[in-house]
Structures are given as C-alpha cells and as structure tokens.
C-alpha cells in the first residue's frame, strides 16, 4: 500500500548511520588514523639502461574512515521480507579514504641514486556492499559486509624514470599492497564499528 517502505526509507536509515553513528563508533575504536604495515619490493631491470628498482614504503597511515567517512552510493534497496526477517542492502562509497606513506626508491636509472618518496593512494569508484537484517521489530544486525574490487589512484611525489613495463609493475605492486592494507582494516576493526552502528538504529518497516 501507500505506507509500504521504500528505497527512500532505506536511504534515510543508511544515511543516518553513515553520517553520525558510524563515525562515532569508528572513532571510539581508534580509527581516525590507522597505522598500516610497511612494505618493500623490487621491480626487475628490463634492459642495460636500468637497474633493479628497490622500493620501500613505511610510516603508512589510513585516514578518512571517521571524517569525511563513507557515503551512500546510489539508492538502497527497499526494506523487504526474507523469510521472517526484514532486509535491506546498499552500496557505500570508499573514495574518501586516503593512504599515505613515506619511502625511498633506488635504481630507477643507471646512476642508482636513492630517491626519497612520499606516496598517496586513494580508492576510485570503489565501494562496500552492506546488508542489514532484523526480525519483526527486533534489533538489526549486519548480514553482509563485502568490499567490492578496489581501484586506486596512485600519486608519488618524486617522479621516477621508469619505462611503461616497469611503471606498470611499480603501480600494480602498490595497488596490491594498498588493497591488503585496506581490507585488513575494513574487514576487521571497521566491520566491528559497522556492526555496532546498525544495531543502534531501528530499521524501516517493509
């Protein structure tokens, strides 16, 4: 009927969580700024005019989980019955997250000088899928928390002299390490903040 729950009710529900409740819970779990692991890798030499490139990044920080935080991406599904439970789903954009590191690279040219670098990595059009479920009038719980395939924009302050093959290898290793760092936080500590948050806001009726 006219009073049936719609995607707009779901949107309001999710917006209320991501705008206030989730940032507060994430902050209480110390997720304003998260230390992420250091890493190192080698990009192999491809010709006599370049050497193996030795790269290391440390002092990694992940920010953006609390402020500006995650935002709803598109419309949520309308609340609907699945068995005896009401369930709704939504995509949340991860593009406000930001990874930063300092580091160094040696071997981008035959001179083999050591270059100090700073690295900034931002997810682009990347999202998480959240599903919340609740028994009739009961406390909501997190049914699904899924991170979809991540794409990154990678920025390095000091340009390295790399041919296309080596540049691709350099960027793909950074993307791989960035994905591991993000998933490690999003699927454990941040998931706990999400679980706490959905429990505290009443779901819309179907």
Label each PLM-derived region with a short phrase:
Residues 1-118, 205-206:
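Tubular lipid-binding modules of the TULIP superfamily
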Residues 46, 60, 95-106, 124-126, ...:
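Hydrophobic lipid-interacting interfaces of membrane-associated proteins
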Residues 67-68, 76, 81, 117, ...:
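Glycine-rich loops and low-complexity Gly/Arg-rich segments
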Residues 77, 84-94, 126-142:
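Terminal amphipathic/targeting segments at protein termini used for secretion
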Residues 89-99, 105, 113-115, 127-129, ...:
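Extracellular/luminal segments of secreted precursors and ectodomains of membrane proteins
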Residues 110-134:
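An exposed acidic His-Trp-rich patch
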Residues 132-202:
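Extended amphipathic ligand-handling, pore-lining, and cofactor/metal-binding catalytic surfaces
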């Amino acid at each position: 009927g006219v009073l049936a729950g719609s995607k707009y009710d779901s949107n309001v529900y999710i917006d209320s969580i991501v705008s206030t409740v989730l940032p507060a819970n994430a902050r209480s779990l110390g997720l304003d700024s998260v230390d992420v692991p250091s890493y190192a890798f080698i990009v192999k030499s491809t010709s006599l005019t370049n050497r193996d490139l030795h790269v290391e990044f440390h002092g990694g920080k992940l920010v953006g989980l609390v402020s500006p935080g995650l935002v709803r991406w598109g419309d949520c599904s309308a609340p609907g019955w699945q068995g005896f439970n009401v369930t709704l789903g939504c995509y949340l954009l991860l593009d406000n997250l930001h990874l930063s590191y300092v580091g160094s690279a040696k071997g981008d040219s035959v001179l083999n000088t050591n270059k100090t670098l700073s690295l900034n990595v931002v997810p682009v059009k990347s999202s998480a899928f959240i599903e919340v479920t609740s028994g009739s009038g009961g406390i909501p719980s997190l049914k699904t928390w899924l991170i979809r395939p991540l794409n990154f924009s990678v920025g390095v302050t000091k340009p390295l002299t790399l041919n296309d093959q080596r540049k691709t290898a350099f960027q793909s290793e950074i993307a791989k390490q960035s994905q591991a760092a993000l998933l490690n936080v999003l699927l454990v500590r941040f998931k706990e903040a999400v679980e706490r948050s959905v429990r505290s806001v009443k779901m819309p009726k179907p």
